[in-house]
């Protein structure tokens, strides 16, 4: 009966510890205990927490004869099991020294046994980690079993060290069973609380990550196409559906670009910004949060608006300049979730990166267009000079041929300067090249032969404008024009799987890699193809000196619309 009463008293003490553990689980202090880590701050926190439990287990223990029935083993074993041998040993030493300071027949034996209990927990920790069984560390059965063995070891140490021996035997017979039961159950329940908190934390973390990934996938590349009303509305609708919040708005520096959710009847896209929260975020570049309680929120557009809180996050572009804001709202009857707040700030960074990438891409495209215009400026005067001289020479002997050459020259410049779009058909590109070649053939006469072999089924394939002409011009200007014999240029096309292959071959074999302006045309074509389609595409060169130069252009096959 005495043992049963002692069990009840120790269980009461254990319940106090479990309540404290449960309260701790609601604080950030509990988070480091939920994972196996080698970080020093986490291990130090583990040492502090379980040392306190260890000391409390002794302090609130029950005095029996010249000893103390206690739940100290819970702190020592859990410290070792979760923190490892070093933490377990230090927790045991701290708890043991505290017990030794209280004196009594078992002071020394209890100090030693507490250190052993901490080391035993640490030993099990090391074995499980080494075997890759981290899940077993957080198993309540493991915690209970290790504590049960630790208590058995403690009783053996008391019998071995405490004197008089008869008193030690009597003490062990009275406290062994109650302490084994309560400490075992207490350690298992403590681990259960920890495991439940860990499962909940992982659930929220996985849900958070899944939402973040889904939002990232759904909004990928939208704002790269331009920071405007259409694209902003697409992003706002995705966020509204995925975040389960009251409303979402996106603004630039002056007006509302998009709004969806509660209050969309008066928050209309195109309206100038009137919210002080938005203006403050744009002016300071900082996140503005009005929770509706500590920081009151009031809609500036409608006195009866049902929105009760808002989070305004700046969107940044080049040089960290604020380009606009993203605003998340909650209704008056709902709290603004801290998860949505954190997620919102992360999404704002993602969208800012898209805006910045879009700005860079547009700048890159403008630079490429400038290079193309530069190439036109280089080619046109030189070619025009030669063409006019050729026409002048032809007009004296064959006015009809001269008329055709004028027509070819007109076609060349029309195609060269007034391309309707960035992409043209292969047939259009060949027409452009042919106009150039007809003038060059009139200039070189029998010294230049041209063969164009383009299958009819490839004629509607799309490719970037001004792709072939610079390559063909290089073949003549730096190749066949240098020959004393007849120069030959062959242009062909074929399909290879999902690729369109274009070849320009001359019989000069005079190709030399160049990095100066003389090679600007071909280098620019190669650069455009790689930037547009990737490094798997572009120009490759094969040259057999004094025999041939073959330029191969690799483009993606584009199915006809």
From Swiss-Prot:
Periplasmic membrane side: 25-43, 94-108, 162-170
Ranges that cross the membrane: 4-24, 44-64, 73-93, 109-129, 141-161, 171-191
SUPFAM superfamilies for this protein: ATPase domain of HSP90 chaperone/DNA topoisomerase II/histidine kinase (SSF55874), GAF domain-like (SSF55781)
Top enzyme category: transferase
Keyword Transmembrane helix applies: yes
UniProt GO BP: cell wall organization; response to nutrient levels; signal transduction
Membrane topology: Multi-pass membrane protein
Keyword DNA-binding attached: no
Enzyme Commission number(s) from the entry: 2.7.13.3
A Gene Ontology term for the protein's cellular component: plasma membrane
Gene Ontology molecular function: ATP binding; monocarboxylic acid binding; phosphorelay sensor kinase activity
Catalytic function, reaction form: ATP + protein L-histidine = ADP + protein N-phospho-L-histidine
Topological region Cytoplasmic: 1-3, 65-72, 130-140, 192-561
Disruption phenotype: Deletion of btsSR has no obvious phenotypic effect under the conditions tested.
Stated role: Member of the two-component regulatory system BtsS/BtsR, which is part of a nutrient-sensing regulatory network composed of BtsS/BtsR, the low-affinity pyruvate signaling system YpdA/YpdB and their respective target proteins, BtsT and YhjX. Responds to depletion of nutrients, specifically serine, and the concomitant presence of extracellular pyruvate. BtsS is a high-affinity receptor for extracellular pyruvate that activates BtsR by phosphorylation. Activation of the BtsS/BtsR signaling cascade also suppresses YpdA/YpdB-mediated yhjX induction.
Assembly information from the UniProt record: Interacts with BtsT and YhjX.
Record protein name field: Sensor histidine kinase BtsS
Provenance organism: Escherichia coli (strain K12)
